[in-house]
Amino acid sequence: MFKSGFVTIIGRPNVGKSTLLNHIMGEKLSIVSSKPQTTRNNIQTILTGEEYQIVFVDTPGMHNPRHKLGEYMVKVAKESMNEVDVALFVTTPDVEVKRGDLHILEQLKSAKVPVFLVVNKIDETTEERLAATLKNYSEAFEFQEIIPISAQKGKNVDKLIELMVKHLNEGPKYYPDDMIIDKQERFIIAEIIREKALRFLSQEVPHGIAVEILQMKEENEKYKIEATIMCEKDSHKGIIIGKGGEMLKKISQSARKSAEKFLDKRVNMKIWVKVKKDWRDSPFVLGELGYKAPKK
C-alpha cells in the first residue's frame, strides 16, 4: 500500500525547523539563519520512498506581525495548518512551556490533525531537563506522538519519518520521484543570496531586505545571474555595500559558491543594492517579489 500526505513543520523562531527539513532532504532547501522569521514563503519539499511520499510544507514562524510582510507570513503559517495530514510542532528542551509555544498550540487545537511533539536540540541538554520538558509539554497539549531529536546530528530523524508515514493514509504519488521542491530555480537562488546577506550582516541590518532576480540565463554550461538586494533605508544600503564594497563582495562570493553547488554549474553573479522605502508595507512591491498580500 502506497501512502502519501502533507506535513507541516511549525514552531517558534529558531527551534530548528529548517535544520530538520534540511537533514531529512539532504539538501539546503530551506533558508537557515539564526534570525527569526527567515522563512517567508510556503515552500513544499517532497520526500519520496518506495512506499510513501511526504510533502513537507515549511512555513514561516508564528509571531505578532508588525507590517504587511509579517501579516503575509503569519497568514501562510495559519493556512498551512488546515491543509495538512500531520503537524510537527518543534520546540527545544527549555523545561517550561514558552509563551510563544502556548500561542501556537492554541492555534493547533482547531487544526484537527495529528500533532507530534518534536523536541529538538537534545544534544545540547541533560536527561533531566529533557524529561521535565516532555512532561510539561505533554500536560499542555494532547500530542499523538512525542519524539526527542537532534536535527543537527540526525539523531532519531529516521524514527520521526517512520512515525509520519504511520499516520498517513493510502494515497497517490503527487509528484515525480525525482522532484524534491515545488519552487523554481530563481526562487532558490534568491533565497541563497538573502541567506548570505542575513548571515554576514549580523544584527546591523534587520529583516528589511529582499532579493529580486533580474536575470538568470544559462549559456555555454555557465549561468549568468543578476540580482538586486532591496533594503528600506539609505543607511542600510551603505552597510550592505560596506567599506570599499567589501561586504557586498563577501555576500556575492559566498552566494555564488552556494549557487554553483545547487546548480552544479559555474556561475557569474552580479548583485546590486537598491533602496525601496517601506517595501514591506507595499502590496505592489510584495506582489512583485512573490508575496501575496493578505486579504482583509
Swiss-Prot record:
Q: Which example biological process does GO assign this protein? A: ribosomal small subunit assembly
Q: Which UniProt keywords apply?
A: Cell membrane, Cytoplasm, GTP-binding, Membrane, Nucleotide-binding, Ribosome biogenesis, RNA-binding, rRNA-binding
* Domain Era-type G span(s) in chain numbering: 3-170
Give the membrane topology, semicolon-separated if more than one: Peripheral membrane protein
Region listing for G2, in residue ranges: 37-41
Q: Which residue intervals define the domain KH type-2 in the entry?
A: 201-277
Q: Name one GO molecular function term.
A: ribosomal small subunit binding
- Annotated region (G3) at 58-61
Taxonomically, the superkingdom here is: Bacteria
Residue span of region G5: 149-151
Report the locations given in the UniProt record. Cytoplasm; Cell membrane
Which intervals of the chain are annotated as region G4?
120-123
According to the record, the residues making up region (G1) are 11-18
Q: What is its main location?
A: cytoplasm
Listed binding positions for GTP are 11-18, 58-62, 120-123
Question: Does the keyword field hold Metal-binding?
Answer: no
List the NCBIfam families hit by this protein, alphabetically: era, PRK00089.1, small_GTP
What is this protein for, i.e. what is its function?
An essential GTPase that binds both GDP and GTP, with rapid nucleotide exchange. Plays a role in 16S rRNA processing and 30S ribosomal subunit biogenesis and possibly also in cell cycle regulation and energy metabolism.
What family classification does the UniProt entry report for this protein?
Belongs to the TRAFAC class TrmE-Era-EngA-EngB-Septin-like GTPase superfamily. Era GTPase family.
Q: Which HAMAP family match?
A: GTPase_Era
Record-given protein name:
GTPase Era
| Annotated source species | Clostridium acetobutylicum (strain ATCC 824 / DSM 792 / JCM 1419 / IAM 19013 / LMG 5710 / NBRC 13948 / NRRL B-527 / VKM B-1787 / 2291 / W)
